[in-house]
């Protein structure tokens, strides 16, 4: 297939994706909110409630991050760091991990992260939201593990509700690296993210 023909075919497929995106937005607008409890996390300055993470915003994004041992989660967080100020102008944004605040501080400093972080260690937040798989679960892989994702919350009627969530992973809508690599004929070609590059 010629270059021009291939680009034309790709453009048609991308147009289909835009149509699907519009359908997703329509579904999202009709969501029935899920009430959630006011979880208490360990913040960098002490205990902090989910409701306090909103600050002066009505909307809040919480990133479910697997912690300092995950190269993939780290790359996603690096990307969020790049757009943090844009997001924070519209909604509150917080990254939650199972690490202690001291570990978070050290790791965030090493990455140059600017967004707020909380620890969900010792809480039921991650499993309640569907971002921890226990041994025996369908995708538990024989043991318990954290799962990466993002949840969107809103303050409504004096409480907190979840209005959306989705997993994070290669080729999702939230990490541009994979989409750029997909423009190469070989795609990622086995490439994986690293904590540091030579």
Model-inferred region functions:
Residues 105-108, 129:
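A short acidic (Asp/Glu
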Residues 88-103, 114-125:
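Thiol-based oxidoreductase modules, predominantly thioredoxin-like and allied folds used
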Residues 119-198:
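Thiol/selenol-based redox catalytic cores and closely related redox-interacting motifs
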Residues 69-72, 82, 117, 130-134:
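Hydrophobic small-molecule pocket/channel-lining residues, especially in calycin-type beta-barrels
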Residues 50-71:
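Short active-site neighborhood of thiol/selenol oxidoreductases, capturing the structured segment around
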Residues 15-53:
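N-terminal "domain-start" segment that seeds a small globular fold
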Residues 1-12:
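Short, charged, low-complexity amphipathic alpha-helix
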Residues 68, 75-95:
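Conserved helix-turn-beta segment immediately C-terminal to the redox Cys motif
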């Amino acid at each position: 297939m010629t270059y021009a023909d291939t680009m034309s075919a790709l453009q048609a497929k991308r147009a289909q994706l835009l149509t699907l995106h519009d359908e997703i937005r329509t579904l999202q607008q009709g969501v029935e909110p899920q009430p959630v409890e006011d979880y208490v996390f360990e913040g960098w300055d002490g205990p902090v409630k989910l409701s306090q993470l909103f600050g002066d915003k009505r909307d809040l994004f919480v990133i479910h991050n697997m912690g300092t041992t995950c190269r993939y989660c780290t790359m996603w967080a690096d990307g969020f760091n790049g757009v943090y100020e844009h997001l924070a102008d519209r909604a509150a944004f917080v990254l939650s991990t199972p690490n202690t605040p001291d570990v978070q501080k050290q790791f965030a400093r090493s990455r140059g992260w600017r967004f707020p972080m909380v620890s969900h260690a010792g809480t039921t937040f991650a499993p309640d939201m569907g971002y921890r798989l226990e041994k025996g679960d369908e995708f538990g892989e024989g043991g318990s593990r954290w799962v990466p994702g993002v949840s969107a919350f809103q303050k409504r009627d004096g409480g907190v509700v979840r209005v959306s969530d989705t997993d994070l992973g290669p080729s999702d809508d939230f990490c541009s690296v994979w989409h750029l690599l997909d423009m190469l004929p070989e795609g990622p070609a086995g490439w994986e993210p690293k904590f540091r590059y030579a």
